[in-house]
Amino acid sequence: SLKQSQESSEYEIAYRSTIQPRTAVRTQSRQSGAYSTGAVSGGGGRVLKMVTEMGSASIGGISPALSANAAKSFLEATDKEKKEMQGLNDRLGNYIDRVKKLEEQNRKLVADLDELRGRWGKDTSEIKIQYSDSLRDARKEIDDGARRKAEIDVKVARLRDDLAELRNRYEDVQHRRESDREKINQWQHAIEDAQSELEMLRARWRQLTEEEKRLNGDNARIWEELQKARNDLDEETLGRIDFQNQVQTLMEELEFLRRVHEQEVKELQALLAQAPADTREFFKNELALAIRDIKDEYDYIAKQGKQDMESWYKLKVSEVQGSANRANMESSYQREEVKRMRDNIGDLRGKLGDLEAKNALLEKEVQNLNYQLNDDQRQYEAALNDRDATLRRMREECQTLVAELQALLDTKQMLDAEIAIYRKMLEGEESRVGLRQMVEQVVKTHSLQQQEDTDSTRNVRGEVSTKTTFQRSAKGNVTISECDPNGKFITLENTHRSKDENLGEHRLKRKLDNRREIVYTIPPNTVLKAGRTMKIYARDQGGIHNPPDTLVFDGENTWGIGANVVTSLINKDGDERATHTQKTIQTGQ
């Protein structure tokens, strides 16, 4: 078969730069069972050759039937090969027509190439002159960009260090603040314990005072009883003296009666001496009996009176002595009790004075700690504001530097592209292949990059940034916490946790750009509660007059806006107690 007998098939296509008109010759020949078809160009520029070779077999020594079959197969193969050759010849003709069209296009391209070659030297020199300065400027800008990038890296590193330091300071302030809070809580607990102990001592002091009053009353009562006992003693002493006088009188009367009786006895004896003996004896006996009876009676009466007087006197004396001893004992006990109570009262008064002094010191220390805490809070807020301002400034600088760096990178990329294109153009000057396409690419790329560069420059140079900084300060518990940038309201805050502040007749003064000044006087008896805020709205700015939370300034419809605004709080004495400063700076590239 043709597939088994075909040994080789070869196509060769060669391209040369010289293009000339050519003629095509189509030949067909048969030699020893081989077919050859070729296209020969007059100039030898393009050659298309197809070679088909077939082997022949010896037919000697075979039978007639086999030779007839072989001849038939050979003829069928020959017819098939003829048809294939016809198809191949048709395809070759189509290829030749296509080659003619391509040669026509090549002639046009050769003309364009000649035209470009005529302009090559002029355009190359102009491009070289045009881009030499740009390349030099680009290299300089690249160097400047690298130097500025290094400076930016140094600034960023320094700002990172500053940020780390501020973070450490913030953590330190936070730690100290927590420590101060713990100390304040401890002092508050100590104050509460001291106050409870003080209340207990005051109750004890009141109890001792009442006990002292009761003892003073008992002492006065006992003193009155003692005075009464002394008066009774004096009366009893006078009575004893009176009774002694009576006894003396009775003794004298008894002595007088005894003398009278003796006189009477003598007289009776004289009478008896004159009377008869019996009568004298009788009267003598009777008289002796009567005298003895009278004497016995008087002795009994005197003895009984004496015993009664002595017993009554001893009883009264013992009663008076017992009362006096009892009064002395009670008086000494009361004196000791009063002395002890006075000592206790003195000790309690000393302890009370010490506790009051300690309480005053603790309250003063708590007040100082509150002031220090407020100062630390203000310093912390100022540090936070400074940090925020620094971060905003750093972000703005970074954004500006990034924009400049992006512009430099865009310029560098544009210059790198132009350098690459310029290098290709210089390299293509020798080969002169595709010059027109490269020139068109240069023109299009340059126009596109110039447009992009213009947009980038417009974006960078059209950027305007606004930086606003706030600064607050206060000399007490009231601060100006917020000032609306649009001039709607001003907010005052009492930072103390337990102390109210009277802001009556205080003045708010707002100075705009060192020109206009707005002054508002707070109504009398306006009290800002501890830990609360007060908003003062301008007229028609949405505020409702609800003291002390919100006030409305009817004198102005705005607090004013400006680039440099200073708001101050001034008390009745004209002292500045708080300030709020707002500065706005606009920067543009």
Swiss-Prot record:
Residues 434-589 are annotated as: Tail. Residues 466-584 form the LTD domain. The lineage of its organism: Eukaryota, Metazoa, Ecdysozoa, Nematoda, Chromadorea. Its main location: cytoplasm. Residues 85-116 are annotated as: Coil 1A. GO terms for cellular component: cytoplasm; intermediate filament; nuclear envelope; nuclear lamina. GO terms for molecular function: structural constituent of cytoskeleton. This is Intermediate filament protein B. GO terms for biological process: heterochromatin formation; nuclear envelope organization; nuclear migration; nuclear pore localization; protein localization to nuclear envelope. The keyword Coiled coil applies. Keywords: Coiled coil, Cytoplasm, Intermediate filament. Residues 131-268 are annotated as: Coil 1B. InterPro entries: IF_conserved, IF_rod_dom, Intermed_filament_ifa/ifb, Lamin_tail_dom, Lamin_tail_dom_sf. Residues 1-84 are annotated as: Head. It is found in: Cytoplasm. Giant body muscle cells. It comes from Ascaris suum. SUPFAM superfamilies: Intermediate filament protein, coiled coil region (SSF64593), Lamin A/C globular tail domain (SSF74853). Residues 286-433 are annotated as: Coil 2.
